[in-house]
């Protein structure tokens, strides 16, 4: 009996301490919000609370459709994607642009020529394009891809790695242009879900029951592996054949505006010290 009473007493004191800790956190959050609203300096105990600084949500409002740049077209209309390159592209980058164009069923490829970026963005907006993809290179090797959504963003900047074109793969044959099935694997964080939102809206919505084409975006350590396969059902099961292109992408910058807006708010950016922080995945 005495042991049980002592245990119940300890449990009561523990629950009471948790309630007091939570009440203290709520009070500090209210003080922080009041200070932010009034512009007054923070109390010292609140300003020095490192745990509060990590856990506080400065904006606890629920995201509505009005905050979603894709709500107007999501699941309703097919995207109009424009694929182009940096100016004066090499033969290999031009070939890669053709293959990227085939990757997205409703896209068109644009020979940029000497068009400057503001004029290119203006032309896309005038033609009611939904997205612009710009491919970049270094000495003939594709190195970067920029995806900008119209009319108000966001714009995602990816570095490209291990790019293998279709004609570098054996026995690829002709590429099917039917609407593909999409697989997004291992995107677990809010940033990862944001990247999925950007990528999936480059493809037409709807069910693709009769399509034998599959495009996979697999996140492994913040490197997004892009693979395209076609499958054939046999008596023994399902046979897969890779048809390319094949490459890895890594997000290094995400902005809320469109491509030509250099003053757009930065939603996320990879800093230099993040390259050595191998223990943390951001996607």
Curated annotation (Swiss-Prot):
Swiss-Prot/TrEMBL GO biological process terms: rRNA processing
Described purpose of this protein according to its UniProt entry: Component of the U3 small nucleolar ribonucleoprotein. Required for the early cleavages at sites A0, A1 and A2 during 18S ribosomal pre-RNA processing.
Cited PANTHER family: U3 SMALL NUCLEOLAR RIBONUCLEOPROTEIN PROTEIN IMP4
Gene Ontology CC entries for this record: Mpp10 complex; nucleolus; small-subunit processome
Compartments, record wording: Nucleus, Nucleolus
InterPro entries per the UniProt record, alphabetical: Brix (IPR007109), IMP4/RPF1 (IPR044281)
Subunit-structure text: Component of a heterotrimeric complex containing IMP3, IMP4 and MPP10.
Keywords, comma-separated and alphabetical: Nucleus, Ribonucleoprotein, Ribosome biogenesis, rRNA processing
MF annotations from Gene Ontology: rRNA primary transcript binding; snoRNA binding
Name this protein carries in UniProt: U3 small nucleolar ribonucleoprotein protein IMP4
Domain Brix: 79-260
Gene: IMP4
Main location: nucleus
Top-level taxon of origin: Eukaryota
